[in-house]
Amino acid sequence: MPTDISEKGLETILVEYLRDKQGYEQGVSDDYKKQYGVDTERVKRFILSTQKEKAVSTGCFANDNEERKFFTRLSAELTKRGVSDVLRKGFRYISELFDMYYPLPSELNPTAKKYYEKNIFCVTRQLFYSANNTDSIDVMLSLNGLPIMTMELKNHYTGQTIENAIKQYQNDRNPKEDTSALLLMKKRCAVHFAVDDDLIMMCTELCGKSSWFLPFNKGVNGGAGNPANPTGIRTSYLWEDILGKHSLSDILENYAQVVKKKKRVKDKKTGKKKDVEKELVIWPRYHQLDAVRQMLDATRKGGVGQKFLIQHSAGSGKSNSITWLAYQLVGLLDGTTPLLDSVIVVTDRINLDSQIRDNINAFKRLKNIVEWADSSATLKDALKDGKKIIITIVHKFQYILETIGTDLKDKRFGIIIDEAHSSQNGSLSAKMNMGLSGNVATDGKDLEDKLNAIIEGRKMVKNANYYAFTATPKAKTLEMFGTPHTKSDGEIEHTPFHEYTMKQAIEEGFIMDVLKNYTTYASFYKIVKTVEDDPEFDKKQAQKKLRAWVERQPETIHQKAAIIVNHFHTMVINKGKMGGEARAMVVTSGILRAIDFYYEINRLLEERKSPYKAIVAFSGTKEYNGKQVTEADINGFPSKDIEDNMEEDPYRILVVANKFQTGYDQPLLHSMYVDKMLTDVMAVQTLSRLNRCHPKKIDTFVLDFANDEETIKAAFQKYYKTTILSRESDPNKLNDYISAIEEANIYTDDEVGTLNKKYWNGVSRQELDPIVNLAVDRFKALDENKQISCKSSIKGFLRTYPFIAAVTSYKSLEWEKLNTYFMLLVHKLPKLKDEDFTSGLIEAIDLDQMQVTKLGDAKIALENTDAEIEPIPMGKGKGGKSEPEMTKLSDILEQFNGINWQNIELAKQQLDELPNRIKGDEAFVNAAKNSNKATAQQQFNSSMLMVVANMLNENTEFCRQYLDNPEFMNFINDRVFQNVYQQVNSAK
C-alpha cells in the first residue's frame, strides 16, 4: 500500500506516538460525557486508585444519583475556576478535598513518584463534544479525565493548511453558539492547537471569529516558522517533546494559569470610573517555555556565579517569562536545601510587582512569597522574614544595597533584571555586587585589604546568578551579561544566552512592523537679518542656535500641529482605523515644545469642532509663560490618570516630552508624530510604542519631522535579529585616561595614597579637604585647553573604571586608589564654562518664511542579518577647546537658508522629478539591480551630478545650491536615493 499522506495519516502519527512512546492511554469518544464535559470513566478510575477512602467517605460513587451529584459539582468547579486550577489545587466535595492530579516528584521522594505514576494521560481522536450536532474534534488530550487540550490537524498533501484549522475553530467551534459544547468553554480546556505539518498555532479562548491564535513555533534563522526536521515532520516536536508526560506536567504545574486583571473604565451611563475584572487564560509560547527551561537547567547544573542575557523582543511576553522564572528559581534544590535563598527582581516598571504577585498566587497553595521593597528597611525585613521573591525599582536599588552591610555573603541570590540596558551602568552594578557579596570595607583591615575587598566586590559576585532581559542590548549589557565565545582571531565575542528576535515577533504577528508606513517631512526656513551692521558669530554655535530658535517659533509649531491634526482626522479617524478607536502620540524634543504642541493641537481640534482632545505628559515642574506648571495643572486631572484617560474619549492624542517613550504598552496607539531627533535604542524604544497588537489593528503610521529613513533603519537594524558584541573592552583604555590626566601634573602619588588611607579609615572630613584642594589649586592654574582635557579624562576614568572592574579579571590597587581620589576631586573642580560666541544673535534676526514639506512615503526594509556592535568607545577625552570660527552674520544666514530654504514649489517640483530622471540613468539602474547597496550609492552620486547639471536651465537656484553646497547635496541625495533604490529593486 502507498504511504498514507492524508489528514488522518498525520492524526495517526501523533496519536500512536503519544500512545506507544509517551505512555498515554488511547480513549474513545464515548468515554467523554457531554453533560459534564469530562471523561467520567477516567476521573472515577483515578480517584478510586488514589483516594478511595475519600470516595467511600462521601459516597460519591455509591450509586448513579450520587455519581451525578459528584460530576455536576466537578463540572461547576471547572467552569468557575478552570482546569489548570482544579488540577493544581483539587476541589472540595462535601467534607473532602479531592486531589485531581499528583505533581512531578523530586528524586528524594519515592512516595510522590508512586502517586505521580497513577496520573492518567489520555489521547482521544475524533471526539464528539456537542449534544446539538455531530461535529468532532480531531484530537483531545485529558489528564485524569479532565480535558486539557484539543487539536485540529491539517495536511499540505491534501491541500489544507493551518489556516483551515484556525477557520474551523473560528467558524464551527464557538461555545457561545453551542452551550452544550462544554469542552470549548473558556478555562475548561487549557489550550486549543491548530496544527499542520509545518506550523503550530494556539488559542486559549475560543470566541468565534474573534478567536486569537498565536504561533507556537521554534523559529527559523531568526524569523517565523519551524526548521526542517531531518528525521520527520517539522511539527513533530509537539508530540515528541512538548506533550511528553514530564513536559506537559511541568507546563500545567508551572506555566498554565488563569489570571484575573482589574481595569478602571468609565461607566457610559454615569460617567464615573469603575473597576472591571477580566480573566486571561495563559499558556506559554514556545520561546518563553524554551528560555525559562534552559535557564533553569543551566542553573541546576552550574549553581550560582552564572550570567544569562535574554534578548527577547517587545511583544515576547517578558513579564510572564520573568514571573515563571522567578517562581521556579525559588523552588530549585541543592540536595535538600534551596539552591537560592532569594530572587530579586530589578525593574523600572512599578506594575510588575502586582503582576508577578497575582501570577504567582495562581500557582499551588503558596501565599505571601512576594515582597515589594522600596527602601533598605523593607528589603532587610524581606530577607529576614524569608521572602523568596523581592521586587524593587532600579533607582531604589543602589540606595538599598549601599545600606545592606556584610551579612549577605553567605546567602545565594538570583537577580532578574528587567530591561537590562536601562538598569545596569557600571557604578550601579558594582554597588549591587558589593551589597550581595558582603565585600565592603570594614574596620580592622589595612588599606590594601580594604581596597582588595572593594575590587572583588565590583566583580560579578560568585554568590548570585544574573538573568538579564532586554530587547535592545547595548555593548555594556552584552559584555556584562552575554555568553563569551573565542573567535578564530582570538578576540572574544559576547552573545545572548537566548533570543526571540524582533524579526520573528513581527513575522509571527506578536508585534506590528512600525516601519512599514513611514513618512518623512522637512522644515524649510528663511531667516533675515534685522540689523544694519554685519556682526560676527561663531559659525558652528550659530547654526545650532538658529536651528533651535526656528523650531520653537509659533509658526513652526502651528504648521506642524496643523499637519498632525489634519492627518489624524482625515487618515486615521475618517478612515476608521482600529474601528474608530485609534490613538496617537506626538513625540517632542522638550517640555516647552510639548506644552506648545498641546495647546496648539487642542486649539486646532476645537477650531474644526472635533470631539477629541489632547493630553500632555512630562515629568516635574516647568516654567511656562512666567508660571510654574505641571502636567496635572495643564491637563486638569492627576498624572496617575493619564494612561486610563487615554483609553477613554475625548482623549485621543498624547503629547510627550521624555515620558511614555518606554514601557508604555497601549495597543490602541496607531499613529506617531515625531518632532525629536532619535537614534539607536531611543529610536527603537520610542517607535515601538506603536507595535502592540490589537484585534482591530492592521497597520501603523509614523510621520517624522526630525529624522531621515537611514538613521531610523540603522537604529532598528542593530536589534532586528541577534545582537553580538564583536570583542571585549580593552582595559588599557584606563591607562590612556591616566596618561592624559598625568600630563596636567595636578597630583602626586603620595597625595593619592595619603587620601585613600585617611578616607578608608574614616577620618574627619576636615582632614580630606586640604589634600584635595592641592590638586584643585593646581588645576585652576592650567590654561583652558588643559583644564578641559584633564577634567574630561577624569570623568572618563570614573565612568569607565567600575564597568571594567566588573567585567574583567584584572586587579589593580592603583586604579582603585585613583578611582577614590578622582571621585572626591571631580566634585571640587571648577565648572568650565563654554564662552558664548553667539550672544546677540537672536536679537539680530527674524523669521521671514517657513514651510513644512512632505518628502516622501517609505516602507523601511531591514536586512536579514545579525548585528555586530563594537565595545563602548573609551577615548582620552576632549583634547581641548576648539577655536571659534567667527563668521559674518550675512554669511551664516546664507548657509543656513541654503540648507533650509528655497522656493518651495520649485524645490518640491525637483524632488518629485529627480526620482524619475535618475531611474532613466542606465548605469545607476544596473548598479542598483546587480550590485550591493554601497556600490549603488556610489554610482547614484555620479549619476545625480549629471542629472542635476542637465537641469541647470530649468532651476538655476536649485542647481547652484546642489553643486555649491555639500550639505544641501547630501540632504537631497539621501532622500532621493532611498526612494529610487527601493523602487528599482521592487520592480525586479
State the predicted function of each range.
Residues 689-718:
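Conserved segment of the helicase C-terminal RecA-like domain
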Residues 2-342, 351, 355-366, 395, ...:
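ATP-dependent helicase/translocase motor core
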Residues 361-402:
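Inter-Walker segment of RecA-like/P-loop motor cores
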Residues 548-656:
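Conserved C-terminal RecA-like helicase domain
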Residues 229-232, 476-581, 598:
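Interdomain helical connector at the RecA1-RecA2 junction of SF1/SF2 helicase-like NTPases
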Residues 387-419, 423-434, 442-456, 635-643, ...:
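Conserved RecA-like ASCE ATPase "motif II neighborhood" in helicase/translocase motors
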